[in-house]
């Protein structure tokens, strides 16, 4: 019988794993021999980048922003211009189909009622997820995302400004 993990334990272990990945020195993985450590830069996909997502992406500029998705291209145009190398989409499912395999993590800042499904799709693909609040609308959805993150061994982080 598997031991249940408390929310506190999950958050501690997830934070420790994220910090551990962020601080692995390049020399451990052989950068001087031409190999770039995975911790040097992450490939990030952004979903919902026109509003709050724009501010979140600003904090991720040191990473590789490889794909951007927003349903309102007029509203998100300034973000598309800020990251000209990123591929643009208006449907996160199309972006996931095309780019999720090459991504390390996904940033979700869409309308509140869409967070859970967009995050779940990324988690089941084995990608780490940063999500704006609220993470979900129900306790059931929250528990489901927590179980998925545990099953797929990824970090699921949500914050509020």
Placement of each model-derived feature along the sequence:
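Loop/turn elements at helix/coil->beta-strand transitions in domains of secreted/extracellular proteins
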Residues: 41-42, 63-64, 85, 102-105, ...
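N-terminal secretory signal peptides and thylakoid transit peptides that target proteins
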Residues: 2-18
């Amino acid at each position: 019988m598997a031991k249940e993990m408390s929310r506190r334990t999950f958050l501690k272990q997830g934070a420790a794993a994220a910090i551990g990945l962020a601080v692995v020195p390049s020399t451990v993985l052989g950068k001087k021999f031409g190999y770039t450590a995975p911790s040097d830069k992450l490939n990030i996909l952004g979903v919902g980048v026109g509003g709050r997502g724009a501010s979140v992406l600003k904090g991720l500029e040191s990473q590789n922003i490889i794909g951007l998705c927003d349903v309102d291209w007029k509203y998100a145009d300034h973000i598309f211009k800020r990251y000209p190398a990123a591929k643009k989409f208006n449907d996160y499912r199309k972006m996931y189909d095309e780019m999720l395999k090459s991504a390390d993590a996904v940033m979700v800042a869409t309308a509140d009622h869409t967070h859970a499904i967009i995050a779940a799709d990324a988690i089941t693909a084995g990608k780490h997820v940063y999500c704006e609040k609220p993470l979900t609308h129900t306790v059931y959805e929250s528990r489901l995302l927590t179980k998925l993150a545990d099953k797929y061994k990824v970090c699921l982080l949500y914050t509020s400004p």
